[in-house]
A protein has these predicted regions:
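Walker B beta-strand of ABC/ABC-like P-loop ATPase nucleotide-binding domains
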Residues: 225
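Long amphipathic alpha-helical segments
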Residues: 176-184, 206, 303, 322
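Conserved ATP-binding subdomain of kinase catalytic cores across diverse folds
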Residues: 3-191, 197, 213, 221-222, ...
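Electropositive polyanion-binding surfaces
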Residues: 196-205, 220
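Catalytic-loop of the protein kinase fold
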Residues: 203-209, 213
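ATP/Mg2+ or Mg2+-diphosphate-binding catalytic cores
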Residues: 291-322
């Protein structure tokens, strides 16, 4: 079965009528109808299969899809509706209850207006300080629906693993000034070692959502994280405050320190915790060493991302010299 042709021809019983918009990502095909969107993971993304998760294996792909849906449905049920299977029925193709015998698994979502994507609203100056507080608060409230899993790795060891991944991530992007990046990476590594005794515990570990300005919607005062299931299983757990620092740092880049503080303030209110603010510089550099290269990666298909990547670079310089 050619999944793409089947959806584009409008031949899937139970899906929308007419021809959908076809959105192609590195690892998925998304078919967007007027009210619903249908996401199917690819099996042939060599880079993803070799470096993150081997989706060429059907059993593994189905397992990944199930976990992805369950995770995102719990965090943003307004968007992630249900999981279905795609199967041959008679002479046609239909959405059915998901099972291992299906041709593919399909994540069914309510459609979203991408003009409400947080990155686009930040670029357009459409988010104010009150919004920042509300976003931090709502994000904190949403994370409370997840219980803390049993995690055997210490925060210290996890940060060392993440640091190794980060070095490879940064060095894989030719547009990144490696001399600048090496300075920031050295700071991150030294901080981890200096805090070894404090980090050498599992108590600081928690679930990690792949959440940032590209992976969230802000519409009518509601903050909706999207696509937050990490591509690599090891990244699903980590220092419990990585999540909010990733969100808050993006607001710092575009709006300023007051916005950063407001996001954190709202999160602290919702979760009844106090963040270690003496870690701010470390956490900001950590988050930016993810987002700076990432924006260059995205610029291969969206040229406007170069300006965003350069904005992250200048922000890093400001934090470094501040």
């Amino acid at each position: 079965m050619n999944i793409t042709e089947t959806f584009l021809s409008g031949a899937v019983s139970g899906a929308g009528s007419g021809q959908p918009k076809h959105v192609v990502t590195a690892i998925s095909n998304i078919f967007v109808f007027r009210d619903k969107a249908y996401k199917v993971y690819k099996s042939d993304s060599q880079f993803f299969n070799e470096n993150f998760n081997d989706l060429s294996n059907k059993k593994n792909r189905f397992n990944f899809t199930r976990k992805d849906f369950e995770w995102n449905h719990r965090l943003s049920p307004e968007i992630y509706i249900e999981l279905k299977g795609l199967s041959q029925e008679g002479n046609g193709t239909a959405l059915v209850d998901p099972s291992d015998t299906c041709e593919e698994l399909v994540i069914v979502m309510n459609t979203i207006d991408m003009s409400d994507q947080v990155i686009r609203k930040l670029i357009g100056g459409k988010i104010n300080l009150d919004d920042c507080y509300e976003i931090g608060k709502q994000f904190g409230e949403r994370t409370l629906s997840f219980s803390k899993p049993e995690i055997n790795i210490t925060t210290y060891q996890d940060f060392l693993n993440r640091y190794a991944d980060m070095v490879a991530w940064v060095k894989s992007v030719k547009e990144v000034d490696q001399n600048e990046a090496d300075e920031y990476l050295a700071f991150v590594k030294n901080f981890i070692e200096e805090k070894k005794d404090e980090l050498d515990t599992t108590e600081l570990m928690g679930l990690c959502f792949d959440v940032h300005a590209d992976n969230a919607i802000y519409s009518d005062g509601k903050f909706l994280p999207i696509d937050t299931y990490a591509p690599k299983e090891a990244w699903l757990y980590g220092f419990k405050n990585i999540n909010i620092y990733r969100v808050a740092t993006d607001f710092y880049v575009f709006i300023g320190k007051d916005a950063f503080d407001k996001v954190i303030e709202g999160y602290e209110k919702a979760t009844n915790q106090t963040l270690p603010r003496d870690w701010d510089k470390f956490m900001i550099l950590y988050c930016e060493l993810i987002m700076w290269p990432y924006q260059y990666m995205l610029s291969e298909k969206e040229s406007w991302r170069v300006d965003i990547a350069n904005k992250h670079r200048e922000f890093l310089k400001t934090i470094w010299n501040g």
